[in-house]
């Protein structure tokens, strides 16, 4: 699976290989009038806030931006420090953010397996059905513990009109998720 931890992901060799590829992608994107967006995930090479900051420090290029998905930074060891982690991301990376995701995060209880949703398509790529691994589950917005008030407030400080893409939901859940997000935007004066 693309989502399960691999030991090489957290080595200097793995980081250097990833850095070279991302550097090349950033240059190529920039040469074609685009920006390559990095989306992090805890089990990937770039998964923590510190690893993200390190990557942007080493690939300081206008062709590289961040796809902000705060839920992808949370693991069992830091989910209880949610506000601290959210503030750390914004305090160190806000100028790199180009697009934002809206989904949620919560502890998965006793289920430590890789989690996938039944989206009604048995042949769907795992990237479309993935909903978390280990002790963390990544449901649709409003179905978890993400501090959306803080997330949207911090996001809007420098990015008031940023595209926010809802993910990890089924088609029939779109109205509920949209109502949830609209309510959070309104409640925070956004």
Specify the residue positions occupied by each region the protein language model found:
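Hydrophobic faces of well-ordered beta-strands that scaffold small-molecule active sites
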Residues: 36-38, 64-69, 98-101, 162-167
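C-terminal helical cap(s) of enzyme catalytic domains, especially alpha/beta-barrels
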Residues: 174-189
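Alpha-helical elements of Rossmann-like donor-binding domains used by nucleotide-donor carbohydrate transfer enzymes
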Residues: 17, 24, 51-54, 88, ...
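Gly/Pro-rich active-site loop or hairpin
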Residues: 15, 49, 72-161
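Alpha-helix N-cap/loop-to-helix initiation residues
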Residues: 44-45, 144, 148, 170-174
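Active-site acidic/histidine proton-transfer and metal-coordination neighborhood
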Residues: 1-68
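Active-site beta-loop-alpha junctions enriched in small/polar residues
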Residues: 2, 41-43, 69-75, 102-107, ...
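Short active-site-adjacent structural elements
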Residues: 108-111, 172-176
